[in-house]
Each structure stands twice: as C-alpha cells, then as structure tokens.
Regions:
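Non-transmembrane "mature" sequence context
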Residues: 1-139
Length: 139
C-alpha cells in the first residue's frame, strides 16, 4: 500500500522538524530567523541549543512551523489554480505571505494569522480565511 503525502508529513513531524527549516523559511520570506522563531514559539536560546546539538525543534514549535508551511502551500495551490500565470512569475508569494501573517484581521477577531498558528483550530480558521479570499468573498 502506498503512503499518502499526509502520512509522510505526519511521519516527518513525528521524527522532528529540523532547525534548518526555520532558516529556510527566513531565507525564502526575507524575514529574520528570530521572527520565524517567534512564530514557532521557540526562544533564541532553545533554538541555538537544539541547533548546536543537531536536535529538532520542540514538538509544539515543529507543529507550528508545519502549519505555516501548510498555509503557504495552500495559498500557492490556490494561486496556481486561479491566478494569472504571467503575474505569478514576478509575484513574491513568500514575502507577501510573511507580511500578511502579521496583519490583524477582523475575520480572526483582530488577531494575526501568526497568532492563530498556536493550535489546530486557529490554523483551520486561517485556512478558511484563505479559502474565502480565493472565492472573492470578504474574508
């Protein structure tokens, strides 16, 4: 039986999200690594300690990082399906998303999408905002 991508992601998170993923996101978005650490809810001290010991992020931080990546992938898929291919060639999706996650949204009770990454219900609420944006509805 072939494993589904969801199972592969589950296994990857269970194995532990490497600290390098934080640096990868920082490079892709242009955000300082400290901002990405803040999204994950991991202190600089913990990050540096885990990085030096070649240990993964703490479980909760790893789940938040994966939620961030999942939301970014959802947005990319939505734009690939319905966006203008010419505009997409020059659109800085990662940079736009990095700014957007820090904007307070009325649809989220004036919380930021970054705040909502703290638990699965908040993550679903952000996914719903993205889906409504795609449909052209007021989020």
């Amino acid at each position: 039986m072939r494993e589904a991508p969801g199972v592969q992601l589950y296994d990857a998170v269970e194995a532990g999200v490497p600290t390098d993923v934080v640096k990868m996101i920082a490079r892709a978005t242009g955000e300082p690594a400290s901002v990405i650490m803040g999204l994950a809810g991991v202190s600089q001290t913990t990050f540096v300690r885990n990085e030096a010991a070649n240990k993964p992020l703490p479980d909760v931080a790893g789940h938040r990082i994966m939620a961030y990546l999942r939301l970014l992938a959802t947005l990319r898929r939505m734009l690939d399906e319905s966006g203008d291919p010419e505009q997409m060639k020059t659109f800085d999706l990662e940079g736009w998303f990095a700014r957007w996650v820090h904007e307070k949204l009325p649809e989220l009770g004036d919380k930021t999408p970054a705040d909502m990454l703290r638990n699965p219900e908040g993550q679903r609420a952000v996914e719903q905002v993205l889906e409504r944006m795609r449909g052209g509805l007021a989020a």
